[in-house]
């Protein structure tokens, strides 16, 4: 008797792998994708099985194929060539340790994108937070806090929203040939934690709803209760969907007996408000409790579409309900970017999938692979029998609560398996991803497919404007970037694949369609503005701009952004508004990023101007906060770390002013021969590219220079009245004072010079008849195109012929001329290029860092010793890590949170704990060997400021 494995029977077929049994059955026409059977089984068994997620801060977290680890990646600009790519994997070792070998099944980011929840197969949840970099995530809640119980497996999960109002944009509509954007303030949807801490709601397989929440001391606590079920068989849940609404948390559950239950749950806190400034321990912290308001039970769900009229089923395939199993359950909210508020009610979306392999009773050719079933959630009044009207008391009827109604909508059939449903672009688009890698965008209200040709005069989203994901390799898990410009897919091997959205930009069939091009630019503008208003990472938008738009199209986009965000570039009058303007740093960062080529190539002028203004803004805000934190009563002692940062920025600000002055002296000498020929002067000015000249002409950067001078005066005057200092604080403040005392340009002289420039610019505007309505145009020309507008040519002549010569008598020009400004990174000379290749400057502290190779140890002054003219140096350990900005590629030497409370408050107020001066996020990197320079580094001149003398460039952070 032959063995069962003989005669051509493949052992792999017994385990569901594709192949032929050679038993007379015709093989399937299309072999299933590797891993798809396991993925479908996983989606049927449990609702929480998301293996990859992209946070709003830009961090991609995914579970490895073995289910034991979590890795993180992120978008980054590569310093070597300026290309935007996906970073290398960084394993989160605390996750593996926390779950003790239990398979990881689900992960989810919170609304802000800073905290990550990870659940394992036993329902144990651990929580992590992005601390100082995208790949530096610290544990906050250990999984060991939860019991090891199969019934506690998570089938639904939702983070509580943050109680904050954000700026939103409804749409872009073309009015008289120009796009008009619809900004409004969007209020958050509760429930909220009264302390604005994190909260996580979970539904377990056994029908328990849990709330994990943080107390004011950042420790985690938990409450739980059972959902109201109609019977014991309903308590075994497979899926749950949760969403925050105005009336509480809406919960939809699906049980093993295929019943759909709907709950409305409120979270009540006692006390309802908590003020950490007034409540002192042992005052009670807010404690939550659950309250169930409504319950709705839907009977056994069928997927044939019984809601249709008999004639509607004609031509549709015939199949039975028993073939299908629920693989996805979601609650879809109306679009969030709606100035009128949420006018429509939520939808419940369920995906039912057929078995992957055909059976004799149910051939696969006769049934679709997936059926998307939808219900509209309506609220109706309770209708009583007329006899109740005869009852004298109407008290009971007056207090009756409205009932929930589920109205079934038209089903959607597909011959492909839907593996993911995501509501993206702030609720304006529903993206359905199929197993072959295709992504289809739908209107959430009507489920109509976006094709990008319906209306080129109104733009609500990227998908509606014609952006799409081209067909690529298949995958089993999908996550979209914060602004849906990119997506990351996990393939069958568990490898991440980056996918980018594309658009024709009006180039079709060799012709140019201006309407489609304009709509595409407006859609990208809308995505960028929504991200800025919601504090969402916008690196995915920059990635598309860099890869797909020409230089001319990028300029068009920048102009649209300035108009959409209503950024008035004219600050000749209202300069105080400049410091608190939330959109200006984002616009400047965008321009700087678009002009970045690589770490060693100078930026183009339209990129170098905003980059320099970002540095000026950083110093201005630093000085403002420095005085704010040290004028309380009683006055707090100055913090050494804060003073060190002030010292570095003071030296940078002074040297920047020297650099500007030196360049203007050279320009004045160059244009001196054309003093009597205005036409020749104008023509030469058109061909002249000077960053210092543009910086002085722009009212925005000129205002920041004035703020810096005000801050330097305050620091110099405050030295005499400062509280007694000791240790490093005394050393740093003394050096700040000496640096200002020995400056070749006095602060009052430079302020007088700025006043002269300001007068020349005002006079030029006044002479040309430019009022407040006309001035933003030339100011924007300075910022966006780095060109001197015709109206300011006379101002340049006045500055070079009168203002600059008046400054010469009040400065030490020899010292300024002999200075080496290569460390500023602004010039295009050979010395600056060599400095870029051999050294880094801490972008926050403005302190030059030592060059560290991967296995070198740099000699340093002993700890506590002070160089001749520099701050104390610390020994550098081997293989020291640093932080690099993923957007501008600049470096920070701090790889740990600030040590002191004052320093932490300062960095947090500046918004630099997790992000760079440009707004890009930090990533931890290993030290790299410096790029070789053609010649040895040029020694510093004798006129340098203290930190740039003695041992070259002082200070490592």
Curated annotation (Swiss-Prot):
One Gene Ontology term of the biological-process aspect is: positive regulation of DNA-templated transcription
Outline the segment boundaries, as ranges, of region: Disordered: 855-883
Q: Where in the cell is it found?
A: Nucleus
Could you say which residues form the signal peptide? none
**Which cysteines bridge via disulfide bonds?**
none
UniProt superkingdom = Eukaryota
Which keywords fit this entry according to its UniProt record? Activator, Nucleus, Transcription, Transcription regulation
UniProt main location, coarse? nucleus
The answer, when asked if Transcription regulation is one of the entry's keywords, is: yes
Any one annotated GO CC term: mediator complex
Q: Which InterPro entries match?
A: Mediator_Med16, Mediator_Med16_C, Mediator_Med16_N, WD40_repeat_dom_sf
Q: How does it assemble?
A: Component of the Mediator complex.
| Family under the similarity heading | Belongs to the Mediator complex subunit 16 family.
Q: What does this protein do?
A: Component of the Mediator complex, a coactivator involved in the regulated transcription of nearly all RNA polymerase II-dependent genes. Mediator functions as a bridge to convey information from gene-specific regulatory proteins to the basal RNA polymerase II transcription machinery. Mediator is recruited to promoters by direct interactions with regulatory proteins and serves as a scaffold for the assembly of a functional preinitiation complex with RNA polymerase II and the general transcription factors.
Recorded protein name is Mediator of RNA polymerase II transcription subunit 16
């Amino acid at each position: 008797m032959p063995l069962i494995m003989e005669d051509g029977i493949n052992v792999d077929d017994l385990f569901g792998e594709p192949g032929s049994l050679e038993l007379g059955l015709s093989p399937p026409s299309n072999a299933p994708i590797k891993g798809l059977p396991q993925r479908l089984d996983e989606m049927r068994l449990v609702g929480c099985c998301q293996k990859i997620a992209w946070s709003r801060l830009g961090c991609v977290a995914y579970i490895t194929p073995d289910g034991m680890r979590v890795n993180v990646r992120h978008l980054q600009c590569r310093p070597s060539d300026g290309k935007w790519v996906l970073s290398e994997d960084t394993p989160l070792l605390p996750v593996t340790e926390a779950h003790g070998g239990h398979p990881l099944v689900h992960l989810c980011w919170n609304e802000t994108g800073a905290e990550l929840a990870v659940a394992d197969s036993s329902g144990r949840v651990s929580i992590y937070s992005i601390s100082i970099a995208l790949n530096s995530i610290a544990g906050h809640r250990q999984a060991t806090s939860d019991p090891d119980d199969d019934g506690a497996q998570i089938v639904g999960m939702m983070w509580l929203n943050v109680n904050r109002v954000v700026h939103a944009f409804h749409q872009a509509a073309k009015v008289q040939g120009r796009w008009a954007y619809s900004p409004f303030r969007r209020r958050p949807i509760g429930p909220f934690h009264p302390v604005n801490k994190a909260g996580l709601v979970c539904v377990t397989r056994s029908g328990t709803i849990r709330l994990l929440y943080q107390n004011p001391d950042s420790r985690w606590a938990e409450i739980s209760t059972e959902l109201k079920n109609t019977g014991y068989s309903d308590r075994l849940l497979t899926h749950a969907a949760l969403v925050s609404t105005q009336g509480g948390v809406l919960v939809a559950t699906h049980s093993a007996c295929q019943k759909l239950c709907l709950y409305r749950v409120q979270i009540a806190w006692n006390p309802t408000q908590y003020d950490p400034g007034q409540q002192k321990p042992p005052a009670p912290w807010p404690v939550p409790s659950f309250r169930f308001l409504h319950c709705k039970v839907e009977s056994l769900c069928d997927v044939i579409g019984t809601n249709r009229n008999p004639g509607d089923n004609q031509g549709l395939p015939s199949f039975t309900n028993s073939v299908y199993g629920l693989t996805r359950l979601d609650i879809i909210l109306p679009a969030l970017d709606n100035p009128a508020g949420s006018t429509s009610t939520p939808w419940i979306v369920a995906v039912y999938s057929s078995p992957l392999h055909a059976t004799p009773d149910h051939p696969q050719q006769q049934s679709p692979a997936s059926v998307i079933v939808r219900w509209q959630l309506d609220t109706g009044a309770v209708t009583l029998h007329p006899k109740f009207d005869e009852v004298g008391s109407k008290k009971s009827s007056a207090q009756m609560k409205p009932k929930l109604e589920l109205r079934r909508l038209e089903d959607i059939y597909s011959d492909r398996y839907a593996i993911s449903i995501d509501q993206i672009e702030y609720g304006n688009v529903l993206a359905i991803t199929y197993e072959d890698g295709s992504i289809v965008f739908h209107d959430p209200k009507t489920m109509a497919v976006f094709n990008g040709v319906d209306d080129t005069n109104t733009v609500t989203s990227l998908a509606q404007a014609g952006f799409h994901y081209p067909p690529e390799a298949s995958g089993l898990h999908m996550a979209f970037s914060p602004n849906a410009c990119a997506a990351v897919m996990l393939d069958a091997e568990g490898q991440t694949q980056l996918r980018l959205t594309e658009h024709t930009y009006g180039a079709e069939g060799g012709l140019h369609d201006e309407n489609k091009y304009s709509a595409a630019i407006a859609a990208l503008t809308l995505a960028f503005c929504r991200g800025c208003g919601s504090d969402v990472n916008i690196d995915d938008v920059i990635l598309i701009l860099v890869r797909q738009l020409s230089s001319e199209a990028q300029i068009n986009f920048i102009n649209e952004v300035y108009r959409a965000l209503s950024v008035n570039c004219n600050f000749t009058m209202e300069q105080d508004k400049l410091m608190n303007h939330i959109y200006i740093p984002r616009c400047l960062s965008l321009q700087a990023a678009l002009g970045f080529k690589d770490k060693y190539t100078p930026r183009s002028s339209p990129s170098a101007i905003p980059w320099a203004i970002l540095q000026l803004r950083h110093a201005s805000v630093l000085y403002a906060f420095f005085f704010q934190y040290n004028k309380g009563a009683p006055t707090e002692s100055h913090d050494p770390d804060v003073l060190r940062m002030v010292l570095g920025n003071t030296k940078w600000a002074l040297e920047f002013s020297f650099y500007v002055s030196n360049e203007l002296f050279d320009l004045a000498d160059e244009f001196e021969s054309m003093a009597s020929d205005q036409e020749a002067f104008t023509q030469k000015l058109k061909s002249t590219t000077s960053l210092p000249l543009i910086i002085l002409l722009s009212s925005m950067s000129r205002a920041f220079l004035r703020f810096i001078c005000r801050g330097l005066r305050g620091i110099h005057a405050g030295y005499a009245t400062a509280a007694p200092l000791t240790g490093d604080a005394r050393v740093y403040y003394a050096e700040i004072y000496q640096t200002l005392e020995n400056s070749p340009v006095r602060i009052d002289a430079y302020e007088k010079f700025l006043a002269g420039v300001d007068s020349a610019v005002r006079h030029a505007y006044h002479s040309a008849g430019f009022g407040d309505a006309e001035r933003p145009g030339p100011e924007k020309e300075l910022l966006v195109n780095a060109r001197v507008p015709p109206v300011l040519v006379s101002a340049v002549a006045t500055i070079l012929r009168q203002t600059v010569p008046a400054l010469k008598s009040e400065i030490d020009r020899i010292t300024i001329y002999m200075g080496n400004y290569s460390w500023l990174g602004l010039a295009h000379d050979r010395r600056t290029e060599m400095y870029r290749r051999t050294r880094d400057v801490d972008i926050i502290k403005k302190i030059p860092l030592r060059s560290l190779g991967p296995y070198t140890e740099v000699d340093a002054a002993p700890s506590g010793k002070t160089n001749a003219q520099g701050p104390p140096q610390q020994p550098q350990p081997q293989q020291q890590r640093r932080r690099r900005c993923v957007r501008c590629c600049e470096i920070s030497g701090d790889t740990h949170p600030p040590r002191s409370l004052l320093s932490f408050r300062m960095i947090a107020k500046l918004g630099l704990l997790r992000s760079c001066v440009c707004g890009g996020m930090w990533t931890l990197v290993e030290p790299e060997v410096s790029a070789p320079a053609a010649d040895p580094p040029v020694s510093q001149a004798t006129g340098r400021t203290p930190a740039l003398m003695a041992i070259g460039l002082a200070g490592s952070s």
